A protein has these predicted regions:
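A short, structured N-terminal alpha-helical element that caps or precedes a catalytic domain
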Residues: 1-100
Length: 100
């Protein structure tokens, strides 16, 4: 019998348009530059190498709403969700976590 792998959603949650959570000073960027979620990406690679099934979802980069993010998460059916957070967006991030 094949062992079922844990599915892990690595999420950079939705927030304000053009909000760069991964930058040195998380904020809405004037030029529209959004840094990719470096630490989530590193961790996703480590988890995949260890045999976990993962999905890295960068909601700000894809301009996803909370509803669209929740739909993608539900379709993936993760056993665990890892959320990237920042002080500037923490209340929103908690709300996203509660929705999922």
């Amino acid at each position: 019998m094949q062992k079922k792998r844990l599915k892990i959603l690595m999420l950079n949650p939705p927030f304000l348009p053009k909000f760069s959570r991964s930058s040195r000073s998380p904020a809405v960027t004037k030029g529209g530059t959004i840094y990719y979620p470096l630490w989530l990406a590193y961790t996703t690679g480590v988890l995949e190498k260890a045999g976990f099934e993962t999905m890295l979802l960068d909601a700000p980069a894809e301009s996803l709403s909370l509803q669209e993010t929740a739909k993608k998460a539900a379709e993936f059916k993760p056993g665990m969700v890892v959320l990237d957070t920042s002080t500037a967006s923490i209340y929103n991030d908690v709300k996203v976590a509660e929705e999922l």
